[in-house]
Amino acid sequence: MFRVRAPWLKTLVELRQGTTQRRALHSKYRHVGFGASAQLQQSCECFIQKLNRELPRDAQLDASIDLPKKTPSYHKHLMLISPPDEAGKDPEWKGSWQAKLELNPEWPYSAIAEVKKHLKETKRGEGILINAISVMRSKSLGDPSSEKKARFLALPDMKVYEVSQSELKDFAYFVGEGMVQQPRGRAVAFADYLKGADAISKELEHREVASTAAAGMKQFAAQSYQNNLVLVCGHHQRDERCGQIAPRLIKEFEAKVEEDLDLAIVSHIGGHKFAGNVIFYKFLGFEADGKATVDSLWFGKILPSAVPTLLEHLGRNEIITPWFRGGCLLES
């Protein structure tokens, strides 16, 4: 992942080859404090001062605020891939991502609200994080085959799906692992409870949750995706801080990491006042049963001049605690 090969990259290679047991890599990292060099500290302070002169008064960067150690609770990240940028226009992440992206009526962004609505009717929809991404660099996330289809990258599934408007409901049921049925029949009576907790639990489960197989849920073909990915929050119309910092961070990552690492700008992931916000997704490989595992690391308060330091410490299996929001292991 880095131009200077590190033990961190070697571990990823071993995992892909199936020579290492599955594990949450972030739990192996050593958390360290951070005593910034005078040069880095001065560079960050100058950047913040310059940026704050360009930002509204109610959207200033404040480096003194402590970063909360909090990330969303989720088991899947579903990302709508924005169409390619058009020459002579603002990039998609700047011109097409309105403050509340799910209210955008234009295709393919209108797919977000539709999928969100139907995920509420599914077994595991509650734990699915949904965003839009604008791909800045990738050899595997090419252009869509049709403008009439929305493309979604799903992690940890490691799949790219193309979905038409008429398929959005079925797609939501597919990624949400089946539709939850409304309870039917008589109410549960006191006599049912006398049969014991196990019996009543089975009765409720039988009533409420439809089996995926029984429901005849539609399946979706997909393109395989097995890359590592860095997401930088750049939801410009929601908060200008991220919108200003994101392209600068992307430029730094492009210069400092190898070309097989995919880079994308992502819509709102929380914590705009702690911009820049960065997510590292590291593909760990497939288990014997075909399930994929992905490790995620969330960071905040990353400024362009801090990128080399962040990468240097990650290369030594170290996490700089003041910049770390949290992390988790995702399993398909």
Swiss-Prot record:
Transmembrane domains' residue ranges: none
One Pfam family linked to the record: Suc_Fer-like
Listed InterPro entries: Aim32/Apd1-like, Thioredoxin-like_sf
Family in the record: Belongs to the AIM32 family.
Name of this protein: Altered inheritance of mitochondria protein 32
GN (gene name): AIM32
